[in-house]
UniProtKB/Swiss-Prot annotation:
InterPro entries: Nucleotide-bd_a/b_plait_sf (IPR012677), PIN4-like_RRM (IPR034186), R3H_Cip2 (IPR034069), RBD_domain_sf (IPR035979), RRM_dom (IPR000504), RRT5_SRSF_SR (IPR050374). The keyword Iron-sulfur does not apply. The keyword Phosphoprotein applies. This is RNA-binding protein PIN4. Involved in normal G2/M phase transition of the mitotic cell cycle. In association with RAD53, also involved in checkpoint control in response to DNA damage. Hyperphosphorylated in response to DNA damage by MEC1. Residues 1-77, 168-214, 374-398, 420-570 are annotated as: Disordered. One of its GO terms (cellular component) is nucleus. The gene is PIN4. The lineage of its organism: Eukaryota, Fungi, Dikarya, Ascomycota, Saccharomycotina. It is found in: Cytoplasm. Interacts with RAD53. It comes from Saccharomyces cerevisiae (strain ATCC 204508 / S288c). GO terms for biological process: DNA damage checkpoint signaling; G2/M transition of mitotic cell cycle. Residues 24-36, 47-74, 450-478, 509-551 have a biased composition (Polar residues).
Length: 668
């Protein structure tokens, strides 16, 4: 029954049945054992292979059975345990290769087998081979001609291949089917994701309406007239078609990113994509051990979930197409949840805009990031505070001294240049010492210096005798408008120069607030900032050799006796006297340009001032010009109406000080 079924079966079925039993038959083991026992009796001395003992008798019986089998008619009934299209070739010399044996069969004009294999036992050839033919007639012809043929002194033994018992065959077939099913299931599960993605990419061009239905009502509700022509609307409506048309994707879709608005860069991306579309991509095979688990809270059988997942997945992989993916803010809560979960799963970032949910990648190259920040106006937050910033002056007090010196040196250079270029005129320096008080006035073209009135020792009294000086200063400073206030006097003590200098520094602690404000902060009209008590410590000052005095408009009243001036004026001011030529050049021309050119000035010798060189004057505080000098000196901030203005101008750099409690003593 089995023989007739094999005869009528097609060659493919016969081949499958034969292959299933090639390596799993007891006949193979018996043949191997026989060939091993036969090789033990080979006479190696004469070089002739002879068979002795029981092996020769067994071989004789096999030859007889083979002869009887060959003499039987081909259409007769064969044994039930043989395969009519498969043969076993035994006793092959070890030195004969498979190709050589096939050449011998071809030289004998025998039909060649469609499958021919040597059998190896633990990697060692034992003289056994299997051959499969397409028809039983070819098999019978090969057995008749090849059986008993001597090759290299050994006679070949060719016979039909025996089949295993029925129970054993069923067991082997069942194991093979189970193993084949497991392999197919594993291959199918691993390739489903990639196949679905490819099919969705190919069919997304025809399914554009499903994508438009998802967002049509939402997009129509958000200012349809203005949104119809916007790049983001075109991007959302054409998202599915863009996934399929890889060559024309950027031609039909404007870029969402702010970096790629230039037409030249836009065209470059189109050309690059056209070139890359023809290249081959070697896709990596997915592995169950490396694939991340999809989120369990989402149903990927839902069409909306699959559509959003496809869009986000393509956006994540196609970095050169666009840098942002936008969804309208009016989508449903379920869609927002799907987008949020999928962004977390794919490693994307959500940015909420007033009208859109913008999806971005976490990885962005540095050049595009800097360009994006510049266009968004966010570059200032990416850089640390510079030394000239008042916000960082609290912890950058070391560099502020060097800034003061540099700015004072620049101001001194500009003074010297103006003195050389201007014409020469004389300016008299008068001395008003009726009460024995030295008078020093120091006014800048940009802003006035604080008035120093140290309990009667130093007071500021302008004495202008030159006609030109009166013309230039009549609108800014007029001594006639300032009533003379009685100044308290102190007795003169005979001290050394060093002691007088130290006493001058100590007097600043008891001065009115006029000596505690940087000169560059106020305007040129009156000494508005002279009542500021916010300087940290007036007793600490840099060395006098490093403090260039603010002497752009200096009018110094000299007493009749020079020795008396040297006793009452600090050493730092003794070497700073200017000639009348320089005084006029500094006063006259610079006063007219006081509003157009503002020069930075030092802060009255205080190391701990928190003002930067950019803090000039505040226009909102000029309303206090009606106050006279006495009010400016003796009135506090709250009484003079300057409290709010000074607090607004200085709170950014003097945040560590108490602006309310002005009677509080300094602790440093």
């Amino acid at each position: 029954m089995e023989t007739s079924s094999f005869e009528n079966a097609p060659p493919a079925a016969i081949n499958d049945a034969q292959d299933n039993n090639i390596n799993t038959e007891t006949n193979d083991q018996e043949t191997n054992q026989q060939s091993i026992e036969t090789r033990d009796a080979i006479d190696k001395e004469n070089g002739v292979q002879t068979e002795t003992g029981e092996n020769s008798a067994k071989n004789a019986e096999q030859n007889v059975s083979s002869t009887n089998l060959n003499n039987a008619p081909t259409n007769g009934a064969l044994d039930d345990d043989v395969i009519p299209n498969a043969i076993v070739i035994k006793n092959i010399p070890f030195a004969i290769k498979k190709e050589q044996l096939l050449d011998i069969i071809e030289e004998m004009d025998l039909p060649l087998p469609y499958a021919f294999n040597y059998h190896f036992d633990n990697g060692i050839f034992r003289g056994l081979a299997f051959a499969n033919f397409t028809t039983p007639e070819e098999t019978t012809q090969v057995i008749t001609s090849l059986n008993g043929k001597e090759i290299s002194g050994r006679k070949l033994k060719v016979e039909y291949k025996k089949m295993l018992p029925q129970a054993e065959r069923e067991r082997i077939e069942r194991e093979k089917r189970e193993k084949r099913g497991q392999l197919e299931e594993q291959h199918r599960s691993s390739s489903n994701l990639s196949l679905d993605s490819l099919s969705k990419m190919s069919g997304s061009g025809n399914n554009n309406t499903s994508n438009n239905q998802l967002f049509s009502t939402l997009m129509n509700g958000i200012n349809a007239n203005s949104m119809m022509n916007s790049p983001m609307n075109n991007t959302i409506n054409n998202n599915s078609s863009n996934n399929n048309n890889s060559g024309n994707i950027i031609l039909n879709q404007p870029s969402l990113s702010a970096q790629h608005t230039s037409s030249s860069l836009y065209q470059t991306n189109v050309n690059n994509q056209a070139q890359m579309s023809t290249e081959r991509f070697y896709a990596p095979l997915p592995s169950t051990s490396t694939l991340p688990l999809p989120p369990q809270q989402l149903d990927f059988n839902d069409p909306d979930t699959l559509e959003i997942y496809s869009q986000l997945l393509l956006f994540k992989d196609r970095e050169k197409y666009y840098y942002e993916l936008a969804y309208p803010m009016g989508i449903s809560a379920s869609h927002k949840r799907i987008i949020n979960v999928l962004c977390s799963y794919l490693g994307l970032v959500e940015v909420y805009d007033p009208r859109f949910i913008i999806i971005r990648r976490k990885i962005l190259d540095h050049a595009n990031l800097q360009s994006h920040l510049q266009q968004q106006g966010q570059m200032t937050s990416a850089h640390p505070l510079q030394p000239n910033s008042t916000g960082g002056s609290m912890n950058r007090s070391q560099s502020y001294t060097s800034l003061l010196q540099a700015h004072a040196a620049a101001a001194a250079n500009s003074i010297s240049n103006q003195a050389v270029n201007n014409s020469s005129n004389s300016n008299t320096i008068n001395s008003n010492n009726g009460n024995g008080n030295n008078v020093i006035i120091n006014n800048n073209s940009a802003s006035s210096t604080p008035k120093i009135s140290s309990q009667g020792q130093f007071s500021m009294q302008p004495t202008l005798t030159s006609p030109k000086m009166n013309i230039h200063h009549s609108s800014q400073y007029n001594s006639a408008d300032q009533p003379q206030q009685p100044q308290p006097q102190t007795q003169q003590n005979v001290q050394s120069a060093a002691q007088q200098q130290q006493s001058f520094l100590r007097q600043q602690a008891t001065l009115t607030p006029s000596s505690r404000i940087p000169s560059g902060y106020s305007a040129n009209h009156y000494q508005i900032n002279s009542v500021n008590p916010l300087l940290r410590n007036s007793q600490i000052s840099p060395p006098n050799s490093q403090i260039p005095i603010n002497s752009q408009t200096l009018s110094q009243a000299q007493p009749p006796a020079q020795s008396q001036t040297q006793q009452r004026v600090p050493v730092a001011y003794q070497n700073a006297s200017l000639s009348s030529q320089q005084l006029y050049n500094l006063n006259g021309p610079s006063s007219a340009n006081s509003q157009s050119q503002l020069l930075p000035q030092h802060t009255n010798g205080s190391v701990h001032s928190n003002f930067s060189y950019q803090s000039y004057h505040d226009e909102s505080m000029l309303s206090a010009h009606n106050l006279n000098s006495a009010d400016l000196i003796y009135k506090s901030l709250s009484h003079s109406g300057l409290d709010d203005g000074l607090e607004q101008g200085l709170n950014r750099s003097l945040s560590g000080l108490d602006l309310q409690n002005q009677n509080k003593k300094n602790l440093w």
